């Protein structure tokens, strides 16, 4: 099943646009979990994990592109999976995508309650329980998503602009406060890092998730594999650079031993920002970090819930009337909000669970799709580099992530706390 190449538009979309779509999808509030989840392995090992994850996630994205090019422009991830791997794989893949969206919705309700509670407490002296803050946050976002997709688009655009400004200013402020002795943990010459390495993989994997947007880039650029692959390269490299800067800024400022206090405090966004404020003792930097964290959580929450909203509307065949959207909104927000009320400090655990499901649909499935695509089509337009060894590497990486999360959930892996 193939089609002729899409017609080249008179004015081709810019390479920057596609790159920003990839980087913007990958980078979100989940980055706040990274310093906490990787505090056990600290900076040097975390760089190695980031590089491995970036490489494997870039490869799996290229494999989706390879398979996608054999189908008409506009073919969805689900369509390609069903045709290449069969209905059974497609059902499991769809369930894993829904699981990721639901668990991330819960994560952002939890993270939103934490950072809103901290913001009100530190900025206005108002004490608001995290459960109530999370509930109000969920209601506000639900109202926007229910109202219209255009409302989400406009608000998210404003938030992204604010995020870029506040992140840039926050990082520039933190980089100047990095202490090499803290960054390289020279105060603990006998510290052991490697036992905590395996448990960090799912958190890192979640931070490089963009794979559902590869078919969208086909609509954006047409069948132009060189342009799409460059967008994947640039977008993922931007995400990698942001994460490395964030890791250096946090792990070079907060001593390793103090992360045990953050973990004991619930491992949430507000706790991390509070510790940074204590150490830097800068009200202006605290205001920037607090603003950035609020915007990051809110924009990620809007993006994820819009995706879940559209997915459920299509699955349940709800129409786009106000009542139809209301039914979809109930299905989208009620289950994760109940979870947020029952388990308000589940942000970092939810990110890990998202990594488990993402290991399936964003790593294992793309590798299997590339293998099936090569058997059927021979990949005449584009082939992800690395041949069969690359497919094996990506499959092993996906399985390792899934196993790591299962073992960590059973407490069979060492925990830094």
Curated annotation (Swiss-Prot):
It is a multi-pass membrane protein. Its main location: membrane. The modification Phosphothreonine is found at residue 8. One of its GO terms (biological process) is amino acid transmembrane transport. It catalyses: L-tryptophan(in) + H(+)(in) = L-tryptophan(out) + H(+)(out). Keywords: Amino-acid transport, Cell inner membrane, Cell membrane, Membrane, Phosphoprotein, Secreted, Symport, Transmembrane, Transmembrane helix, Transport. It comes from the Bacteria. Gene3D superfamilies: Amino acid/polyamine transporter I. The chain crosses the membrane at residues 16-36, 40-60, 97-117, 126-146, 155-175, 191-211, 232-252, 295-315, 326-346, 347-367, 390-410. GO terms for cellular component: extracellular region; plasma membrane. It is found in: Cell inner membrane; Secreted. One of its GO terms (molecular function) is aromatic amino acid transmembrane transporter activity. The keyword Chaperone does not apply. Belongs to the amino acid/polyamine transporter 2 family. Mtr/TnaB/TyrP permease subfamily. Involved in the transport of tryptophan into the cell. This is Tryptophan-specific transport protein.
């Amino acid at each position: 099943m193939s089609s002729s190449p899409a017609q080249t538009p008179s004015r081709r979309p810019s390479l920057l646009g596609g790159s920003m779509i990839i980087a913007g999808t990958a980078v979100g509030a989940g980055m706040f979990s990274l310093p906490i989840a990787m505090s056990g392995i600290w900076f040097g090992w975390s760089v190695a994990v980031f590089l491995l994850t970036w490489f494997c996630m870039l490869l799996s994205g290229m494999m989706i592109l390879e398979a996608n090019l054999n189908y008409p422009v506009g073919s969805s991830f689900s369509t390609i999976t069903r045709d290449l791997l069969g209905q059974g794989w497609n059902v499991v893949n769809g369930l894993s995508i829904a699981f990721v969206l639901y668990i991330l919705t819960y994560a952002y309700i939890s993270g939103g309650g934490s950072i809103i509670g901290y913001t009100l407490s530190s900025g206005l002296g108002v004490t608001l329980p995290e459960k109530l803050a999370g509930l109000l946050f969920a209601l506000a976002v639900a109202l926007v998503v229910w109202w219209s997709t255009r409302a989400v688009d406009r608000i998210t655009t404003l938030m992204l602009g604010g995020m870029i400004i506040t992140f840039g200013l926050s990082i520039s402020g933190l980089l100047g406060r990095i202490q090499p002795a803290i960054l390289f943990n020279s105060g603990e010459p006998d510290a052991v890092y490697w036992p905590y390495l395996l448990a960090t993989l799912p958190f890192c994997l979640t931070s490089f998730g963009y794979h559902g947007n590869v078919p969208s880039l086909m609509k954006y650029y047409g069948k132009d594999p060189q342009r799409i692959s460059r967008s994947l390269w640039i977008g993922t490299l931007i995400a990698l650079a942001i994460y490395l800067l964030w890791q250096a800024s946090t792990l070079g400022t907060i001593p390793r031993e103090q992360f045990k206090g953050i973990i004991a405090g619930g491992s949430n966004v507000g706790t991390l920002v509070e510790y940074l404020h204590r150490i830097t003792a800068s009200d202006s930097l605290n205001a920037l970090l607090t603003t950035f964290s609020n915007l990051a959580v809110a924009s990620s929450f809007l993006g994820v819930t819009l995706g879940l909203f559209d997915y459920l509307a299509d699955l349940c065949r709800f129409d786009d009337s106000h009542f139809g959207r209301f039914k979809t909104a109930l299905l989208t927000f009620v289950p994760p909000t109940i979870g947020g009320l029952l388990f308000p400090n589940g942000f970092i655990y939810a990110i890990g669970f998202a990594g488990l499901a993402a290991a399936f649909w964003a790593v294992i499935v793309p590798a299997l799709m590339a293998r099936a695509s090569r058997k059927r089509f021979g990949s005449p337009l584009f082939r992800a580099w690395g041949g069969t060894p690359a497919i094996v590497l990506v499959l092993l990486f996906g399985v390792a992530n899934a196993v790591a999360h299962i073992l960590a959930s059973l407490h069979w892996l060492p925990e830094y706390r």
